[in-house]
C-alpha cells in the first residue's frame, strides 16, 4: 500500500464540521464591514519578494526568518504573502485607485509564515484585514477601532478582549528615541540576550518586544517613546484617546507597543485577550502614512489593521459556545418508490426558485424511509418533505416538522408558502 501523504506541518485542513462556524463568523464580520461602507479587494497570495522587504523592513523577524521565499523558473524571487497590507498598497498603486482618492477596503484569505506551530498560530493562517487610504485624522483611526469593538459585541466576546494603544510618532521622533534607547541598551549590554544584542543596532525598537522576562524588567527603566513624540503626533494621539473615551471604548496606553513591522507611524493598537492562556493578540494595526510613497506611489495617508481568524474562532468557541454554526440544511427531501426520484428533483428545483435562501438537500442513494429520516437528522434538517408513489400520483407532498413531529399533506403548489412559515 502506498504511503499516505500528510498535510504540511502547521498548514491545516478545516473540515465541514469546522467551516460552518467559520462561515457564520466571517459572515458576521462582513455584515459589519458593509454597514461601515468598506469594499472587498481580492489579492494574489504570491508577490515579488522585494515588495515585502521594502514595505515590512529587511531587519524584521518576518523578513529575516519567517517568509516562504523561492525562485520561479525565470529566476525571479517570489514570496507567499506573510501579511496583506503590502499587497493591498501595491494593488492600489498599480491600478491607480489611491491618488487623491479615499478608499476603504477589506480582504480576507490565507497568509504564510514559517513559525513554530502552536495553538492559534500556524504556518498557513487566515487574516481579515481593513485598509483606509486618503484620510489622516484621528477620527478614521477611531472608526476602525469602533468597528472592531462592534465585531466583539456581535460575536459575544467583548468582555474578553482589551484595547491597548500607543503612538510611535513620526520618523524624526523615532530617530530621536532610537538614539536614547540605544544609549540605554549599551549601558546594559551585559544583561541582554543574543537576540536583543543583535537587534540593538539594527532595529532597537524591536527589543521592546522581547519575551525574555529578565529583560522586560530591565526595560522598566528604559526611555519611553511617548516622551519623544513630535507635537503633531502627540495631538493626534490625544485626540484619538478623547474620541474613544467619548465613544465609550476603554483602552490602556502601552508605551512598549511598537508592532513588529517597520511601516507603522503614529497610532498603533492591539486588541488582546488572556482567555486563550497567555496573553495573545486578536487584532492589531495602526497608521502607515509613508508606505504608499515608499512603494512608488504619491504620498497618501493610510491606516489599517489585520485580525487572525484562527485565534478569533478559538476565542469564540472558548468564551461564547452559544455562538454556533447554523444548521446544515433547512429541509431534507425524502422519496421512495417508482418515479419518485425524478419528481423529487423537480420539486426541489421549484422550491429553490421560490425560496432562494432555502438550504434544501435531496436524498440520493436510496434507502427506506427510516434510513432517510435518520439522514435528515444527521444533517440537522428542521423539516422533512416526503414523496411516495401515492403523493406523486396526487401531486402532493408530506411536510413534517422534525422538531415536534407534526405533519400535513399539501398540494405541491402550497409547499413553498408552508416552508416559509415553518422556517421563519
Swiss-Prot record:
Keywords assigned by UniProt, alphabetized: Aminoacyl-tRNA synthetase, ATP-binding, Cytoplasm, Ligase, Nucleotide-binding, Protein biosynthesis
Principal EC category: ligase
Cell division is among the record's keywords: no
GO molecular function per UniProt: ATP binding; histidine-tRNA ligase activity
PROSITE patterns: AA_TRNA_LIGASE_II
Catalytic reactions of this protein: tRNA(His) + L-histidine + ATP = L-histidyl-tRNA(His) + AMP + diphosphate + H(+)
Protein localization: Cytoplasm
Pfam families: HGTP_anticodon (PF03129), tRNA-synt_His (PF13393)
InterPro entries: aa-tRNA-synth_II, aa-tRNA-synth_II/BPL/LPL, Anticodon-bd, Anticodon-bd_dom_sf, His-tRNA-ligase, HisRS-like_core, HisRS/HisZ, HisRS_anticodon
GO biological process: histidyl-tRNA aminoacylation
One GO CC term on file: cytoplasm
EC numbers for this chain: 6.1.1.21
Family from the record: Belongs to the class-II aminoacyl-tRNA synthetase family.
Subunit relationships: Homodimer.
Name of this chain's protein: Histidine--tRNA ligase
Organism: Pectobacterium carotovorum subsp. carotovorum (strain PC1)
Amino acid at each position: 500500500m502506498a504511503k499516505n501523504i500528510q498535510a504540511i506541518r502547521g498548514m491545516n485542513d478545516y473540515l465541514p464540521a469546522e467551516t460552518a462556524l467559520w462561515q457564520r463568523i466571517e459572515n458576521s464580520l462582513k455584515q459589519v464591514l458593509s454597514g461601515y461602507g468598506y469594499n472587498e479587494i481580492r489579492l494574489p497570495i504570491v508577490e515579488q519578494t522585494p515588495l515585502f522587504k521594502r514595505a515590512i523592513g529587511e531587519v524584521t523577524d518576518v523578513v529575516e526568518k519567517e517568509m516562504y521565499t523561492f525562485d520561479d523558473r525565470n529566476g525571479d524571487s517570489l514570496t507567499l504573502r506573510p501579511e496583506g497590507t503590502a499587497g493591498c498598497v501595491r494593488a492600489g498603486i498599480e491600478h491607480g485607485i489611491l491618488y487623491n482618492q479615499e478608499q476603504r477596503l477589506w480582504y480576507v484569505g490565507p497568509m504564510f509564515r514559517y513559525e513554530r506551530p502552536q495553538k492559534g498560530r500556524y504556518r498557513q493562517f487566515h487574516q481579515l484585514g481593513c485598509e483606509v487610504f486618503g484620510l489622516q485624522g484621528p477620527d478614521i483611526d477611531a472608526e476602525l477601532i469602533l468597528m472592531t469593538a462592534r465585531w466583539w459585541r456581535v460575536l459575544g466576546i467583548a468582555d474578553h478582549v482589551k484595547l491597548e494603544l500607543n503612538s510611535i510618532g513620526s520618523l524624526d521622533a523615532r530617530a530621536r528615541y532610537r538614539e536614547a534607547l540605544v544609549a540605554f541598551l549599551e549601558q546594559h549590554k551585559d544583561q541582554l540576550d543574543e537576540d536583543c544584542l543583535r537587534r540593538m543596532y539594527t532595529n532597537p525598537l524591536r527589543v521592546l518586544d522581547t519575551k525574555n522576562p529578565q529583560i522586560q524588567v530591565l526595560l522598566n527603566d528604559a526611555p519611553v517613546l511617548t516622551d519623544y513624540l513630535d507635537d503633531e503626533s502627540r495631538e493626534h494621539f490625544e485626540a484619538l484617546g478623547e474620541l474613544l473615551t467619548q465613544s465609550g471604548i476603554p483602552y490602556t496606553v502601552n508605551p512598549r507597543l511598537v508592532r513588529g513591522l517597520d511601516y507603522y507611524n503614529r497610532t498603533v493598537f492591539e486588541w488582546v485577550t488572556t482567555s486563550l492562556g497567555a496573553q495573545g493578540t486578536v487584532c492589531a494595526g495602526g497608521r502607515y502614512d509613508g508606505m504608499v510613497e515608499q512603494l512608488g506611489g504619491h504620498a497618501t495617508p493610510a491606516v489599517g489593521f489585520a485580525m487572525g481568524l484562527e485565534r478569533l474562532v478559538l476565542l469564540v468557541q472558548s468564551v461564547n459556545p452559544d455562538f454556533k454554526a447554523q444548521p446544515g440544511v433547512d429541509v431534507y427531501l425524502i422519496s421512495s418508490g417508482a418515479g419518485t426520484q425524478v419528481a423529487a428533483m423537480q420539486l426541489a428545483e421549484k422550491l429553490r426558485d421560490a425560496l432562494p435562501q432555502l438550504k434544501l438537500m435531496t436524498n440520493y442513494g436510496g434507502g427506506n424511509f427510516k434510513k432517510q429520516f435518520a439522514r435528515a437528522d444527521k444533517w440537522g434538517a428542521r423539516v422533512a418533505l416526503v414523496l411516495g408513489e401515492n403523493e406523486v400520483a396526487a401531486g402532493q407532498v408530506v411536510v413534517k416538522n422534525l422538531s415536534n413531529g407534526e405533519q400535513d399533506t399539501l398540494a405541491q403548489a402550497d409547499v413553498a408558502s408552508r416552508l416559509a412559515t415553518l422556517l421563519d
